[in-house]
Amino acid sequence: MSTFSLKIIRVGITVLVVVLAVIAIFNVWAFYTESPWTRDAKFTADVVAIAPDVSGLLTEVPVKDNQLVQKGQILFVIDQPRYQQALAEAEADVAYYQTLAAEKQRESSRRHRLGIQALSQEEIDQASNVLQTVQHQLAKAIAVRDLARLDLERTTVRAPAEGWVTNLNVHAGEFINRGATAVALVKKDTFYILAYLEETKLEGVKPGYRAEITPLGSNRILHGTVDSISAGVTNSSSSADSKGLATIDNNLEWVRLAQRVPVKIHLDSEDQQYLYPAGTTATVVITGPNDRDPHQVSPMTKLMHRLREFG
């Protein structure tokens, strides 16, 4: 074989290798930049901020931090004697005005029976007015009693749902104010994923699509379903000045950063058992209308998926 032919073969092989490398790099780049996936995803759950509706000293805190509690279980109790005394006083007022109202009712009925032959119209009207006033006082006393009873009931704070008590920062003997958050309750079976996907990848994301979730530092793959895509995010490039005019940031036209949009993903019921704390990180891959079949994926694609999902 001549020297010229060898050169042609070498050049051809080199060109072929370069073309294959360019194609491979392009495919990898498209795989990483266009496919709907993100490492910026967070485990999230419904969290209830527990705060008392009355103020007072804490007498009991029978739960521990991070304890699983049932719906209706006592979380803490506020000192009750003051509220018991207020209820007793309100009940006494109700009893007094009930007796007084009955007495004024009899008096008014008696005067109406006697009529203007024995009494003046003014005396009859006066009895009716007194009865009406006492009835209003009775209604007010009943309202005060009901409020005192409600306050007494609210001294015992119970779990509104089944879940985990977390960030418990109160103890027996402390004074707690009405409305001050004492503990957070992470509701059980409410965990979901908020995946922050770039806007360039939203074309491949639709409600009902399946998703794979890989928690950071874990080999376990969880599954879920896309619930919804956020309807809007903050426009950081525009704001209003003191006169209400629009203020637009100066951006370079050739540098455009893709905005991230929250996508809510519901975990499958069988994956709710795996407890990953709310706020922890995960990698999310949107697989389309159906779950990804691991037997139909090439080894190279599996490797690329794993490198992408590795946290």
From Swiss-Prot:
Swiss-Prot/TrEMBL keywords: Cell inner membrane, Cell membrane, Membrane, Transmembrane, Transmembrane helix, Transport
Membrane topology of this protein: Single-pass membrane protein
Pfam annotation, one family: CusB_dom_1
Main location, first listed in the record: membrane
Example of a GO MF term: transmembrane transporter activity
Localization in the cell: Cell inner membrane
Entry GO CC: plasma membrane
Transmembrane domains' residue ranges: 11-31
S-S bonds: none
Entry-linked InterPro entries: CusB-like_dom_1 (IPR043602), CusB_D23 (IPR032317), MFP_Efflux_Pump (IPR050393), PHBA_efflux_pump_AaeA (IPR022871), RND_pump_MFP (IPR006143)
Protein family (similarity comment): Belongs to the membrane fusion protein (MFP) (TC 8.A.1) family.
Function: Forms an efflux pump with AaeB.
UniProt xrefs under NCBIfam families: PRK10559.1, RND_mfp
Protein name: p-hydroxybenzoic acid efflux pump subunit AaeA
Species of origin: Yersinia pseudotuberculosis serotype O:3 (strain YPIII)
Taxonomy of the source species: Bacteria, Pseudomonadati, Pseudomonadota, Gammaproteobacteria, Enterobacterales
